[in-house]
């Protein structure tokens, strides 16, 4: 039986041109409802599940493709930094973790910077990729964010930042924490120049990034259902020994309590941010041309007649 299964059947399938492999992730499960969604339907809907509206995590490059005009952009080269300055090792060496993350994502680190346009408006866009070590903030990510602010200042462009992070990168210790004040200075310089800075908080945005650049925007937009906060809900419950309210630290809860300005679907993000940029840049909105009012001759004659 093994000979038939392992040799004869594959040989017949090969001769007949049959496909014996099933593509991975052909069907994707909705984490909220358990519904199975065909991957092509999900891709065409920007990885927002049509029935429930659940926003799946997406990569930095997918984010740029969906967000910018025609999916076209120029990716900026990030500054080079010293790898593993502390020679850190836990269960694995930090350098090995970096190699694994690079192989998994195709990125050099968690930040991707790009130049592009939104409805014709030139912008600088910074995206954190959660798939790269949880989007953690280290020296490379910090330098990349500071570089994005510098490019925005040089080119006099607004900056839009998509945050997705678990916080500071523990393998870099105090060097990671130093990125909090560095990025904050970058935000201040952009604001002094009068350039808009819009932050989009995606799932999840936690830890040190919420104590720095991620909560310093002119406008804060959150994707639906995103977890946003400094410490996670489990840590808070264990610390205060109390049950947290339903939806605590989720986008909708934070908007109700004034922590974010609006909750916007990924499908409407481009139009919303373009409208905000036009307002912040004091650009004239689209106005319909005035239609001339044509009056009947009798009315014109009556208005022209001198009054007694």
Swiss-Prot record:
Residues 26-295 form the CoA carboxyltransferase N-terminal domain. It comes from the Bacteria. Its main location: cytoplasm. GO terms for cellular component: acetate CoA-transferase complex. It holds the Pfam family Carboxyl_trans. One of its GO terms (molecular function) is ATP binding. It is found in: Cytoplasm. InterPro entries: AcCoA_carboxyl_beta, Acetyl_CoA_COase_Trfase_b_su, ClpP/crotonase-like_dom_sf, COA_CT_N. One of its GO terms (biological process) is malonyl-CoA biosynthetic process. Pathway: Lipid metabolism; malonyl-CoA biosynthesis; malonyl-CoA from acetyl-CoA: step 1/1. It catalyses: N(6)-carboxybiotinyl-L-lysyl-[protein] + acetyl-CoA = N(6)-biotinyl-L-lysyl-[protein] + malonyl-CoA. Keywords: ATP-binding, Cytoplasm, Fatty acid biosynthesis, Fatty acid metabolism, Lipid biosynthesis, Lipid metabolism, Nucleotide-binding, Transferase. Its EC number is 2.1.3.15. The keyword Transferase applies. The keyword Repeat does not apply. It is an enzyme of class 2 (transferase). Component of the acetyl coenzyme A carboxylase (ACC) complex. Biotin carboxylase (BC) catalyzes the carboxylation of biotin on its carrier protein (BCCP) and then the CO(2) group is transferred by the transcarboxylase to acetyl-CoA to form malonyl-CoA. Belongs to the AccD/PCCB family. Acetyl-CoA carboxylase is a heterohexamer composed of biotin carboxyl carrier protein (AccB), biotin carboxylase (AccC) and two subunits each of ACCase subunit alpha (AccA) and ACCase subunit beta (AccD). NCBIfam families: accD. This is Acetyl-coenzyme A carboxylase carboxyl transferase subunit beta. It comes from Mesorhizobium japonicum (strain LMG 29417 / CECT 9101 / MAFF 303099).
């Amino acid at each position: 039986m093994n000979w038939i299964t392992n040799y004869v059947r594959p040989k017949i399938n090969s001769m007949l041109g049959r496909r014996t492999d099933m593509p991975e992730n052909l069907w994707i499960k909705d984490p909220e409802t358990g519904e199975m969604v065909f991957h092509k339907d999900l891709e065409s809907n920007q990885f927002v599940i049509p029935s429930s509206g659940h926003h799946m995590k997406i990569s930095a490059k997918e984010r740029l493709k969906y967000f910018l005009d025609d999916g076209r952009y120029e990716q900026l080269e990030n500054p080079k930094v010293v790898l593993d300055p502390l020679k850190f090792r836990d269960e694995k060496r930090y350098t090995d973790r970096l190699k694994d993350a690079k192989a998994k994502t195709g990125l050099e680190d968690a930040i991707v910077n790009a130049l592009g346009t939104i409805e014709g408006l030139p912008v600088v866009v910074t995206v954190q990729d959660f798939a790269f070590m949880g989007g953690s903030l280290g020296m490379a990510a910090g330098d990349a964010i500071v570089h994005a602010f510098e490019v925005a200042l040089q080119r006099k462009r607004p900056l839009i930042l998509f945050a997705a992070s678990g916080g500071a990168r523990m393998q870099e210790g105090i060097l990671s924490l130093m990125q909090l004040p560095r990025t904050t200075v970058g935000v201040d310089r952009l604001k002094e120049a009068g350039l808009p800075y819009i932050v989009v908080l995606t799932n999840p945005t936690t830890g040190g990034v919420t104590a720095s650049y991620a909560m310093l925007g002119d406008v804060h937009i959150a994707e639906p259902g995103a977890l946003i906060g400094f410490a996670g809900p489990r840590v808070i419950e264990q610390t205060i020994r109390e049950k947290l309210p339903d939806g605590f630290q989720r986008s909708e809860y934070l908007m109700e309590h004034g922590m974010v300005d609006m909750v916007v679907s990924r499908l409407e993000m481009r139009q919303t941010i373009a409208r905000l940029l036009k307002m912040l840049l004091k650009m004239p909105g689209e106005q319909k041309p005035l239609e001339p009012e044509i009056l009947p001759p009798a009315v014109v004659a009556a208005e022209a007649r001198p009054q007694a």
